[in-house]
Amino acid sequence: MRNELKVTILQSDLFWENPDANRRMFSEKINNINENTDLIVLPEMFTTGFTMNASFLAESESGQTLDWMKIQANKKNSALVGSFIVSEKNNFYNRLFFVEPNGDYYTYDKRHTFTLANEHLTYTSGKELLTINFLGWKICPFICYDLRFPVWARNTCDYDLLIYIANWPQKRIHAWDTLLRARAIENMAYCVGVNRTGKDDNLNQYNGHSAIYDVLGKQLTTTKYEGNFYETIILEKTHIVSERAHFQFLSDRDHFTLN
């Protein structure tokens, strides 16, 4: 088990509905990460932007983008996280992939599809949570709109690290900032949020605010950047253990199950 986990957040603009251009761009950005890192986190739908044009852009799970993620993870000896559009059994999914350096991978389908943008009319909602054990860290990943639903992310001491990847628009960025911090505090877990920047072809503007928070809600990244950047932060398991033992907030939680 590793006490330290180095996490790199990679915030970027995206080429609209252009997987080849986005893969090339992220190949260069990942290659330019100078320090060693254990985990690299990309935005939601990093190959296309947040589009409903799934019938044109969807891939099979074993398609080109997953192959690309495996190559990047192996080259950097780091796990790589991001989502893209997957077609499976006549359904489309906004599917997150957690790809390890050895090529093993895990998937999570976005649970809460964004009805305001009619995402629910195009994409099928996921039904299962995902918890990954990576280097002795228990990691629970989510996608964008999931952030607004705290019960879905409720921690019963099952995980150490929350990850949210997003295309979260500038006009609602206050909610993003507030809820990322809240998810860290209420679950006594590190919380990583990676959002995109730029403007998409639906005229949505994005200003990033990617960040990492500790178990008490302290922001560990240097600032809420609004441009394209990466930053690597070292997380410490001993911090989680000591703060949970001291405060014991999770022991006082209500006990219930989701149907």
List the predicted regions and their residue ranges.
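Cys-nucleophile CN-hydrolase/nitrilase-fold catalytic domain and related Cys-dependent amidase chemistry
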Residues: P19-D20, S27-P101, P169-R183, A189
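N-terminal active-site segment of His-dependent metallophosphoesterases
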Residues: M1-L39, I163
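Active-site catalytic loop in hydrolytic enzyme cores
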Residues: S87-C157, K171-T178, H239-L250
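Long hydrophobic alpha-helical segments typical of transmembrane helices together
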Residues: Y206-N259
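Beta-strand-turn-beta hairpins that frame and shape the catalytic cleft
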Residues: M1-T8, T131-C140, L161
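Short hydrophobic-aromatic micro-motifs
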Residues: I40-V41, W137-I143, I163-Y164, V192
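CN hydrolase (nitrilase-like) catalytic-core segments centered on the catalytic cysteine
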Residues: Q64-V81, R148-N228
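Short beta-strand scaffold segments in enzyme catalytic cores
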Residues: G82-F84, R95-F98, L130, S210-I212, ...
